[in-house]
From Swiss-Prot:
InterPro entries (alphabetical): Acetyl_CoA_COase_a_su (IPR001095), ClpP/crotonase-like_dom_sf (IPR029045), COA_CT_C (IPR011763)
Role this protein plays: Component of the acetyl coenzyme A carboxylase (ACC) complex. First, biotin carboxylase catalyzes the carboxylation of biotin on its carrier protein (BCCP) and then the CO(2) group is transferred by the carboxyltransferase to acetyl-CoA to form malonyl-CoA.
Reactions that this protein is recorded to catalyse: N(6)-carboxybiotinyl-L-lysyl-[protein] + acetyl-CoA = N(6)-biotinyl-L-lysyl-[protein] + malonyl-CoA
Any GO CC annotation of this UniProt entry: acetyl-CoA carboxylase complex
Cellular localisation: Cytoplasm
EC number: 2.1.3.15
Pathway per the UniProt entry: Lipid metabolism; malonyl-CoA biosynthesis; malonyl-CoA from acetyl-CoA: step 1/1
Family: Belongs to the AccA family.
UniProt xrefs under Gene3D superfamilies: 2-enoyl-CoA Hydratase, Chain A, domain 1
This protein's name: Acetyl-coenzyme A carboxylase carboxyl transferase subunit alpha
Organism superkingdom: Bacteria
Molecular function per GO: acetyl-CoA carboxylase activity; ATP binding; carboxyl- or carbamoyltransferase activity
Length: 319
């Protein structure tokens, strides 16, 4: 069953009206082409009006859409010869992180991504895209390998956050995330991070220390989920919509703040409308960024990442 949101209701009603007219025209053999064409033009305008003026909370809804493409959907459209590697060589294979090696535009690369499931059963297997420490250690193993063999690193971010259960804490969740941050800051190879859905807290940042940070048009990247923010600030998770506006976490906000380096255009309505078109835009943007970064020496790549991190946020000292 397709998932639709309240703000899409006018579009759905008009689509249904057009479908009914087309069916009626066919059944009764009546030419209703002028009326149908008029409604089609109105539908195009309505889609542009609604999807071109989405509020932050509406973008959150699209980023979480049950049919939103994940890494496995994009991989065959972005890469050749993707070979997945599993396990952290210490404890287990975390299914909320996927990674391996591939060919991107003729260049060998290492790719690492969060991944959610399709449906309840797979989401439980993948812990709804929330990695445990072994997931981040798997990512670190793959990125260390990329450094050893001088392969660029491409990460894809889509997680509500890191797993926060007792088992995750017992196995060193904070340490695992910190190791990823430390390692990514010091690598000599280009790193491009792309937020393809949710970018939640330290669980996202663990794959987010890059020379270039790109966001899909309807994705978001935040220190906290809007529901959690509302619970803390107003003791009311129902105020998530207000929190979403206050957090300034949309792709457009982050580009203005200098946290994002680019926005990847999505089809009207979201990436789930056409994974092929979204992947095409993604491939073009990543290829341009990679071509630029491959011209830079290792020291400059490290300095670039360090300065990017140090410029996140603002603070002022008061006596």
């Amino acid at each position: 069953m397709a998932q639709h949101f309240d703000f899409e209701k006018p579009i759905l009603e008009l689509e249904q009206k057009i479908a009914e007219l087309q069916e009626f025209s066919k059944e009764k053999d009546i030419n209703l082409s002028p009326e149908i064409s008029k409604l089609m033009r109105r539908l195009v305008r309505l889609r542009k009006e609604i999807y071109g003026n989405l509020e932050p909370w509406q973008k959150v809804q699209i980023a979480r859409h049950m049919e939103r493409p994940n890494f496995y959907d994009y991989a065959p459209l972005l890469f050749e010869d993707f070979m997945e590697f599993k396990g952290d060589r210490l404890f287990a294979d975390d299914k909320a992180i996927v990674g391996g090696i591939a060919i991107f535009q003729g260049i060998p690369v290492t790719v690492v991504s969060h991944i959610k499931g399709r449906g309840t059963k797979e989401n439980i297997q993948r812990n709804f895209g929330m990695p445990h420490p072994e997931g981040y250690r798997k990512a670190l193993r793959l990125m260390d390998q990329a450094e050893k063999f001088h392969r660029p690193i491409l990460t894809f971010i889509d997680t509500p956050g890191a797993a926060c259960d007792l088992e995750a804490e017992e196995r060193g969740q904070g340490e695992a995330i910190a190791r990823c941050l430390q390692a990514m800051a010091g690598y000599s190879v280009p790193i491009i991070c792309t937020v393809i859905g949710e970018g939640g807290s330290g669980g996202a940042l663990a794959l987010g220390v890059g020379n270039k940070v790109l966001l899909l048009e309807n994705s978001f990247y935040s220190v906290i989920a809007p529901e959690s923010c509302a619970s803390i600030l107003w003791k009311d998770p129902g105020k998530a919509k207000e929190a979403a506006s206050a957090l300034k976490f949309t792709a457009q906000d982050l580009l203005e703040l200098g946290i994002a380096d680019g926005i990847i255009k999505e089809p009207l309505g979201g990436a789930h409308r056409s994974v092929e078109r979204t992947a095409e835009e993604m491939k073009k943007t990543i290829a341009e960024a990679l071509a630029e970064l491959r011209e830079l020496p290792p020291d400059e790549l490290r300095t670039m990442r360090y300065e990017k991190l140090m410029n996140y946020g603002e603070f002022e000292e008061k006596a």
